[in-house]
Amino acid sequence: MKKNTHLDYKQVLFVDSSTGYKFVCGSTYQSDKTEVFEGQEYPVCYVSVSSSSHPFFTGSKRLVDAEGRVDKFLKRYSNVKPAQPVQVAEEPVAKGKKKPSLKKKK
């Protein structure tokens, strides 16, 4: 078995950036930033949504996402011009000619 393949599992401080709620949970997350929480120093992970801010857990219909997927899409494609419709020339059908039958002849 290879040695040193697994990351270190340690206690990490998670901070909800929208509400400021803090909680400690075991994780393999690695961070250079640290904070003191309840007398101990922990690596910090900032999350945009947690149980204190998610509408399912809070029961409110508050907008959680500050800059979501729709905003990114609109920002990316707001300067794009709509494509011009392609004009297809139709071939005139000669009158009196029948179209070939698709049935097999015996």
Swiss-Prot record:
Domain of life from the UniProt record: Bacteria
CC terms in the record's Gene Ontology section: ribonucleoprotein complex; ribosome
Residue stretches of biased makeup (Basic residues): 95-106
UniProt entry keywords in alphabetical sequence: Ribonucleoprotein, Ribosomal protein
Listed InterPro entries: Ribosomal_bL28/bL31-like_sf (IPR034704), Ribosomal_bL31 (IPR002150), Ribosomal_bL31_B (IPR027493), Ribosomal_bL31_sf (IPR042105)
GO biological process, one term: translation
Pfam families listed in its UniProt record: Ribosomal_L31 (PF01197)
Keyword Zinc set for record: no
Molecular function per GO: structural constituent of ribosome
Region (Disordered): 85-106
SUPFAM superfamilies: L28p-like (SSF143800)
Alphabetical list of NCBIfam families matching this protein: L31 (TIGR00105), PRK01678.1 (NF002462)
Similarity annotation: Belongs to the bacterial ribosomal protein bL31 family. Type B subfamily.
Subunit structure: Part of the 50S ribosomal subunit.
Protein name according to UniProt: Large ribosomal subunit protein bL31B
Underlying gene: rpmE2
